[in-house]
């Protein structure tokens, strides 16, 4: 595990312990049951791809450990509406505070502003966080294989399925991919960013995509900035993309989203 993930993991475990003391699991589960119906995340992506179009998971992200502040003018509901109007299929919303300046309210407020399914983008180590995610209104959660053991991954996935949520399983190399395909989720994200060095290359997806068993919905993550990047990754079977930073830096997020998804002339 990389230094950054070790650092994040350490404070996350402290956060989880503090959250459990402040709000017992039974209380969080009660909130989760009252959160309303789940919007189908994976089904929305599949339906979009089945039309022959690209499916975009558009990310609402204020900052990151590697880039610092990404967007000062940060209004999650307005950004969610812009993404929806621009053609996004789903949203990904950062809820991690220390590293990404995210917050649970960002997810709840953004989801309330649109009809799109929403992923809680955070570092998941405990099934308590899954109930938390549903209580926030999340429709899907992320499992980063570099951050968890196989047993943790299975427990978190089963907890998500128990809440009828979808799971995006993220990998960066062959070893993580081999572990990920043992899980049940059809959503498999290939992160082009190396979490050890933070270097980013689309060649990661090009290398790993051919190794993925059929039936999985591949998601290209990180390093995607232009329509040419989508075209490049589509050549190895990727038609669903998670894009955040490049869109967050634009003045007109709706127009930038539409331009990214525009079919080649």
From Swiss-Prot:
Q: What class of enzyme is it?
A: lyase
The Enzyme Commission number assigned here is: 4.1.1.48
Question: Entry's PROSITE patterns?
Answer: IGPS (PS00614)
Q: Could you tell me what reaction this enzyme catalyses?
A: 1-(2-carboxyphenylamino)-1-deoxy-D-ribulose 5-phosphate + H(+) = (1S,2R)-1-C-(indol-3-yl)glycerol 3-phosphate + CO2 + H2O
Gene3D superfamilies, alphabetically?
Aldolase class I (3.20.20.70)
Q: Which UniProt keywords apply?
A: Amino-acid biosynthesis, Aromatic amino acid biosynthesis, Decarboxylase, Lyase, Tryptophan biosynthesis
Q: Which GO terms describe its molecular function?
A: indole-3-glycerol-phosphate synthase activity; phosphoribosylanthranilate isomerase activity
Pathway in which this enzyme or protein is active: Amino-acid biosynthesis; L-tryptophan biosynthesis; L-tryptophan from chorismate: step 4/5
Task: Report if keyword Lyase is assigned.
Answer: yes
According to its UniProt record, what is one Pfam family this protein matches?
A: IGPS
Q: Which InterPro entries match?
A: Aldolase_TIM (IPR013785), Indole-3-glycerol_P_synth (IPR045186), Indole-3-glycerol_P_synth_dom (IPR013798), Indole-3-GlycerolPSynthase_CS (IPR001468), RibuloseP-bd_barrel (IPR011060)
Query: One GO biological process from the UniProt record?
Result: L-tryptophan biosynthetic process
Entry similarity comment = Belongs to the TrpC family.
* Protein's recorded name: Indole-3-glycerol phosphate synthase
